[in-house]
């Protein structure tokens, strides 16, 4: 699916551009891939900025101790439509207001479970701090996956698999 984005170029030197050619040339390297490039009006930019977007992630998690497969699966299942409270994470508190935000974990599936690691696929509300949800961020994310599992865990890799935009109400 990819991650939608808006790019504004102020005072461009070239005013006419072939988006198909730009897309082709941009995709000639392995850094990133682009598709469906198109021009939009300012109103579309404002709608995009105001849209909520539930996201589906895949994370590889490392545990501080030995994990039990059944316990990981049960912890994952316990978060079906679960509400969590997330205080602004330490890693972003220098640029975000220190608030407690209410978020929802829609579902979690666990797999690739070994003695001390596992993968989670999960869908969350827009704005959920997934790394902090898994680790607990020293009690700033409650409940956390680590808390439910009973073992401290840390996200080693995180991939966004899908972004499900809900266009804001017009009016």
Task: Explain the meaning of each model-derived region.
Residues 1-171:
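RNA pseudouridine synthases
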């Amino acid at each position: 699916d990819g991650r939608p984005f808006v790019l504004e170029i102020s005072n461009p030197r070239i005013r006419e551009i072939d988006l198909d050619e730009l897309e082709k040339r941009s995709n000639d390297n392995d850094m990133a891939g682009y598709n469906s490039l198109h021009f939009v009006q300012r109103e579309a930019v404002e709608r995009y900025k105001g849209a909520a977007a539930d996201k589906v992630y895949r994370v590889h998690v490392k545990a501080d101790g030995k994990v039990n497969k059944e316990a990981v699966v049960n912890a994952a299942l316990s978060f079906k439509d679960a509400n969590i409270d997330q205080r602004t994470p330490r890693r972003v508190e220098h640029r975000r207001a220190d608030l407690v935000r209410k978020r929802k974990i829609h579902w979690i599936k666990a797999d690739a479970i070994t003695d001390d690691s596992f993968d989670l696929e999960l869908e969350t509300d827009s704005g959920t701090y997934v790394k902090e949800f898994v680790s607990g961020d020293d009690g700033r994310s409650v409940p956390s996956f680590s808390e439910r599992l009973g073992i401290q865990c840390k996200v080693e890799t995180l991939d966004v698999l899908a972004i499900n935009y809900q266009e804001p109400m017009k009016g």
